[in-house]
Amino acid sequence: GRAIAIALRKALADAETPADRVDLLAPFGTGTRNYDAAEAAAWNEVFGSRLSEIPAMTTRGAIGVNGAGTGAIDFAATVTALARNTIPPSLNTSNPDPASRFRFVQDDPKDARITHAVTVSYALAGGQTAALVVRKVEE
């Protein structure tokens, strides 16, 4: 989880966005005990007690892990949620590990004013981790 926490912190710093401005999280969420525990520890480290207050979404329960394309798919889903102010439900996430403290949207899409979102992706074999902050620009 250390690389994920570093990527999250660097993305927030590069975007000049404090963690308390983020209103949508898009964790990778493999659905496997060890990977999810490491990822949850990273998100908990960066977002602290606020983690359980921020809506979260993941595409993993709907489409699984898609190799190198997973990050691009998650980015597209995150941008779409931001543009539509609608958070899609995270399928097959009804029993997440309580230690993760993610607040996944369940069952139906949720309308929400989203201005800043964070998505993360990493290689399951290790070595590559990326996080992006997406910000809505008002015209």
Regions found by a protein language model. Give the residues of each.
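Conserved "HGTGT" condensation-loop signature of ketosynthase/thiolase-family condensing enzymes
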Residues: 1-139
